Regions:
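SAM-dependent transferase fold signal centered on methyltransferase-like domains
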Residues: 1-446
Length: 446
C-alpha cells in the first residue's frame, strides 16, 4: 500500500523492494535484522559486494543498486520507498532527482500556471482534477520524479529521455504509480522538440555535468542548451519551466534568458530545511496585447514563501540601525532562499527590523518579530574584539555555534582564536557595523 504524500511513514512501512526480497529469498542471502535502521546499512552493502563470488547467479551490482536506491528514497522519496514495486535507477540519477517536497512544489506551481494557460478559474481546480486539453512535455525525464508529480494535473503528459534504461525504469514506475495518461518516449530532447507541434507546459531539468563528468553551474554549459533552444521552446509552449542549479547566479540567468526579449516571468528559489535545493525559472512570451508580466521573485523555504516584484525591490533602500546592537534586542538571520535572492531592503520594508549594516545581512529589532522568515535570536551580550571584552563575554562559555557575516575571518579561524568547541545553546555572530567596527554578538535562539 502506498500512502499519499504528506502522510507519516514509519520505519516499518519501508519494505525492501520486491526484486530485492525475492532475490534474497531465492538465493538464501541473509541481511542483518537491523538492516534499514541506520548506520549499519553502508557497511552491510560493502559486505554483500565482497561476497559476489558466493552468489554467481545473482546480478550483484543490480541488487546492490536497488538496495542503495531504496535507502536514498526513504529520506528523499518516502512515498516511493514505501512501494515495494518501485525500481531504482543508477546512483547518479538518484542523486540528481528531486525530493518529494520539491517535486510537490513544482506540481503546485504547474497547477497555477495552468490557470492562465487554459482559463481554469483557480489552481485548486487544476490540483484536484485533470485540466482538459492540457499537455505536459518533460524533455529531460531522468528518474521521472518531477514528471510523476507535475503530470497529475495534465490530460496528457509526455516523458522524453535519451537513455533507454531510464525509459524502461520510468515506464515501469509510472504504471506502478497509476499514471495512465503518460507516454514514455526514448529520444533526444532536441530532436523531439523539433518535432513537437505545441504543449501547454514544457519542463526541463538540464544535465549539469560537463563532458568530463564534473558539475557545472553555468546555464549555457548545461545539456540541453536552453539558451540555444529558447526561441523554439517559447514557440512550442505556452509556458516553459526550467530547473537550474542552486549554485547558479539567478541574476545572470535572467539576463541570459532575456537576451531575446522580456520573457522571464518568475524566479523561484526553493529551499528545504534552510538548504537551497534548486532554482526554477518560468519563461513565456508576452501576452496578446504586447504587455509583459513584471518579473516576480519567490523565495521558498519549506512552507514559507515570500514573493515580490523585482522592480519593487530594486527601488528600495535598506534601513540600517542608527547605533550598534545592544543586549536585549532581537537578531534575525534570513533563510537561505532570501539570502540568495539578495532582497535585504525588502525585509526592512515588510518587517519591523533594520540591518546591522548594508552588507551584514543581519537584522535587529527592539521587540520580537515573530513572523520573520528566518532564524530569530535574542542578543544577550555585545562586545568589540578587544581581548579584555571578548574574555568577559565568553566567561563560562566553552562551546558555541559560530557564524560570520561581513567579517574578515572564517568560522574556522574565529573558532580557533576564541578556543571554543562547536555546538551548545550559545550562538555567536561576528560582523561589522555601519561605522566599520567589528562586533561579536552573543545570542540565544528564540
Amino acid at each position: 500500500m502506498v500512502k499519499k504524500q504528506g502522510d507519516s511513514l514509519q520505519q516499518e512501512e519501508f519494505p525492501l523492494p520486491k526484486y530485492v526480497q525475492e532475490t534474497l529469498s531465492k538465493h538464501k542471502i541473509s541481511l542483518s535484522p537491523t538492516f534499514g535502521m541506520g548506520k549499519v546499512e553502508g557497511s552491510l552493502l560493502d559486505t554483500l559486494a565482497f561476497q559476489t563470488h558466493r552468489y554467481p547467479d545473482v546480478d550483484m551490482p543490480y541488487l546492490l543498486n536497488q538496495i542503495a536506491g531504496w535507502q536514498t528514497a526513504k529520506a528523499k522519496l518516502p512515498t516511493w520507498a514505501a512501494n515495494e514495486d518501485i525500481i531504482y535507477p543508477p546512483h547518479l540519477s538518484m542523486e540528481q532527482c528531486s525530493s518529494e517536497q520539491t517535486a510537490g512544489y513544482k506540481l503546485q506551481l504547474a497547477a497555477r500556471l495552468l490557470t492562465t494557460a487554459t482559463g481554469v478559474n483557480d489552481a485548486s481546480h487544476a490540483l484536484s482534477q485533470i485540466v482538459p486539453g492540457s499537455l505536459l512535455v518533460d524533455l529531460t525525464g531522468g528518474f521521472g520524479v518531477d514528471f510523476s508529480f507535475i503530470s497529475r494535473c495534465f490530460e496528457r503528459a509526455v516523458y522524453v529521455e535519451q537513455q533507454e534504461k531510464l525509459c524502461e525504469v520510468a515506464q515501469h514506475n509510472f504504471q506502478v504509480l497509476g499514471l495512465s495518461q503518460v507516454e514514455v518516449v526514448h529520444a533526444d530532447s532536441t530532436e523531439y522538440l523539433h518535432s513537437l507541434s505545441h504543449a501547454t507546459l514544457i519542463y526541463l531539468d538540464p544535465a549539469r555535468r560537463n563532458e568530463q563528468g564534473g558539475k557545472t553551474v553555468l546555464i549555457n554549459d548545461c545539456t540541453p542548451d536552453v539558451i540555444t533552444l529558447e526561441s523554439e521552446l517559447l514557440e512550442k509552449a505556452d509556458t516553459v519551466m526550467i530547473k537550474l542549479s542552486p549554485m547558479l547566479d539567478w541574476h545572470r540567468a535572467v539576463d541570459e534568458l532575456n537576451r531575446i526579449g522580456d520573457v522571464v516571468r518568475e524566479v523561484h528559489i526553493v529551499s528545504v530545511r534552510n538548504e537551497c535545493k534548486e532554482l526554477l525559472i518560468i519563461i513565456k512570451q508576452k501576452s496578446n496585447d504586447g504587455e509583459a508580466e513584471p518579473l516576480r521573485i519567490v523565495c521558498v523555504n519549506d512552507g514559507n514563501a515570500i514573493s515580490y516584484a523585482a522592480l519593487e525591490a530594486k527601488d528600495m533602500q535598506q534601513k540600517v540601525i542608527a547605533s550598534p546592537p545592544v543586549a536585549g534586542q532581537f537578531l534575525y538571520e534570513p533563510n537561505t532562499s532570501l539570502m540568495k535572492s539578495g532582497c535585504f531592503a525588502l525585509l526592512t520594508e515588510r518587517y519591523d527590523v533594520a540591518a546591522v549594516d548594508v552588507n551584514s545581512h543581519l537584522f535587529v529589532s527592539e521587540t520580537l518579530t515573530t513572523d520573520f522568515p528566518g532564524r530569530s535570536f535574542e542578543i544577550t551580550d555585545v562586545s568589540s574584539f578587544n581581548k579584555k571584552e571578548v574574555r568577559r563575554i565568553l566567561s563560562g562559555i566553552t562551546k558555541a555555534n559560530i557564524a560570520v557575516r561581513n567579517f574578515p575571518m572564517s568560522v574556522a579561524d574565529l573558532r580557533k582564536r576564541l578556543k571554543l568547541k562547536e555546538g551548545g545553546d550559545v550562538y555567536l555572530f561576528a560582523t561589522t557595523d555601519a561605522s566599520g567596527n567589528h562586533l561579536l554578538l552573543v545570542c540565544r535562539k528564540v
